[in-house]
Design a protein with these regions (language model features):
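A short, flexible N-terminal coil/short beta segment enriched in small residues
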Residues: 1-17
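Glycine-rich beta-alpha loop elements in corrinoid/cobalamin-binding modules
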Residues: 2, 18, 22-26, 31-94
Length: 94
């Protein structure tokens, strides 16, 4: 299974530690990648980048600054790949 752990950081200089911890926990079980974007990236660019990599599952780390864009991305990802598994984590999920 090809898995993506991703997020939209608020700035280019930010790094998401949560997805790195998760990657370390599952790297022996699945083929896992990390891709980080920022809220300044165009959603079409992010969608294309994710779609072309052909992931089986995509998990987003969500926060107050990215939740609306991530929801839009999830809707569009499902339109182009209805079989992909999508999961959300982080403080905005609860």
């Amino acid at each position: 299974m090809k898995v993506l752990l991703t997020t939209l950081n608020s700035k280019f200089i930010h790094t998401n530690l949560a997805i790195r911890y998760i990657k370390e926990s599952i790297k022996d079980l699945v083929d896992v990648d990390i891709r980080e974007y920022t809220i300044n990236n165009q959603l079409d660019y992010i969608l294309k980048d994710i779609y072309l990599a052909k992931y089986d599952a995509i998990f987003f780390s969500t926060y107050i600054w990215n939740i609306y864009d991530i929801v839009k991305l999830c809707e569009n990802i499902k339109k182009v790949n209805p079989n992909v598994i999508i999961g959300l984590g982080g403080p905005e999920v609860s």
